[in-house]
UniProtKB/Swiss-Prot annotation:
Record has NADP as a keyword: yes
Any one of the GO BP annotations: L-arginine biosynthetic process
Lineage: Bacteria, Pseudomonadati, Pseudomonadota, Gammaproteobacteria, Moraxellales
Record protein name field: N-acetyl-gamma-glutamyl-phosphate reductase
UniProt keyword list: Amino-acid biosynthesis, Arginine biosynthesis, Cytoplasm, NADP, Oxidoreductase
Similarity-based family: Belongs to the NAGSA dehydrogenase family. Type 1 subfamily.
Length: 349
């Protein structure tokens, strides 16, 4: 049994971590911090956990966190990098659900997040936690940068094409049209997130530039093993009036080799042994409600024209897009079965 700390337990990803870990047979949450709710029982804030835990929120105490085997940071950007060096020096592993360890390019990090990186030496040795594509490195990692929710759908949606020995798509013409429920914006109150602003409404945001764009580009370059080939990639996220769920529609142009490839078989073979990636039959339509509450991503392919491919990828942004994937990474880091604590089936209806 490993001991777990969660820094930032009052946000949506923090409480989702707690919900998942309370069912984990080999992990026990011992520390749960909050800057604003110290001393308050968790079940008083989240009644779904009543009867399942007697934990109370506490102030962040680095010495208490050092006693844990692993600490998750479900905090704003910039928090984990302030504490990661001390924790790993004490032998504690770190999994950050913010952006502190996602981008290796410091210039891009500082540009998009408006801060200098506090521990570039730790960043250099950290591992990007897209589980299905980085499994062996994750097993050896001390610090994990958990991927963003949108980048998770994009990477898993495109990986079979980019990992192929042949160039199957035109990498400069990729268009990503992505939609997310409002929980992706976090729990902090803001005018744009209140019910009357979002109900019966549907809008794009970050059209001029979104923080996940450089993460997507860097990650795709690593998958493809090529630099500067995704300059023309377009990414536009949208906010839809639902609580959880994410659907990314990815449009690509096929090369001559891509036109001749059995793409459905390519995807089915690539993900044949993956427990959390479901390749649906061709021309299917993955629905967000089918993965609600589950650590699963569903993919479907359409080929509307000989030189065009549409990839649909659906996930729960709080689970496979955040906390579930973080626990998946934790399982690998400690040698557990990868699906330990993550066998939940999506909630439907």
């Amino acid at each position: 049994m490993i001991s777990v700390g969660i820094v930032g337990g009052t946000g949506y990803t923090g409480v989702e971590l707690l919900r998942i870990l309370l069912r984990h047979p080999k992990a026990q949450v011992r520390v749960l911090t909050s800057r604003t709710e110290a001393g308050k029982p968790v079940a008083d804030m989240f009644p779904n956990l009543r009867g399942h835990t007697d934990l109370q929120f506490s102030d962040l105490n680095i010495d208490a966190l050092k006693e844990c085997d692993v600490v998750f940071f479900a905090t704003p950007h910039g928090v984990a990098m302030q504490h990661a060096k001390d924790l790993i020096a004490a032998g504690t592993k770190v999994i950050d659900l913010a952006a502190d360890f996602r981008l290796q390019n410091l210039e891009q990090f500082e540009k998009w997040y408006g801060m200098e990186h506090a521990c570039p030496d730790v960043l250099k040795d950290s591992v990007y936690g897209l589980t299905e594509l980085n499994r062996e490195k994750i097993k050896q990692a001390q610090v994990i940068g958990n991927p963003g929710c949108y980048p998770t759908t994009v990477q898993l949606g495109l990986a079979p094409l980019l990992k192929s020995a042949q160039a199957l798509i035109e990498t400069k013409n990729i268009i990503i049209d992505a939609k997310s429920g409002v929980s992706g914006a976090g729990r902090k109150a803001s005018l744009g997130m209140i019910y009357s602003e979002n109900a019966d409404n549907f809008k794009a945001y970050g059209v001029a530039g979104h923080r996940h764009h450089p993460e997507i580009v860097e990650a795709l370059e690593n998958i493809a093993g090529k630099k500067d080939v995704f300059e023309g990639l377009l990414f536009v996220p949208h906010l839809v009036p639902m609580i959880r769920g994410m659907l990314s529609t990815i449009y690509v142009d096929l090369t001559e080799a891509g036109k001749q490839t059995a793409l459905q078989a390519l995807y089915e073979n690539f993900y044949a042994n993956e427990k959390f990636v479901d390749v649906m039959p061709a021309n299917s339509s993955p629905e967000t409600r089918s993965v609600r509450g589950a650590n699963e991503l569903r993919i479907a392919l359409y080929k509307p024209q000989p030189n065009k491919l549409i990839i649909l990828a659906a996930q729960d942004n709080l689970v496979k897009g955040a906390s579930g994937q973080a626990v998946q990474n934790m399982n690998l880091m400690f040698g557990f079965n990868e699906d330990e604590g993550l066998q939940g089936i999506g909630l439907l209806p």
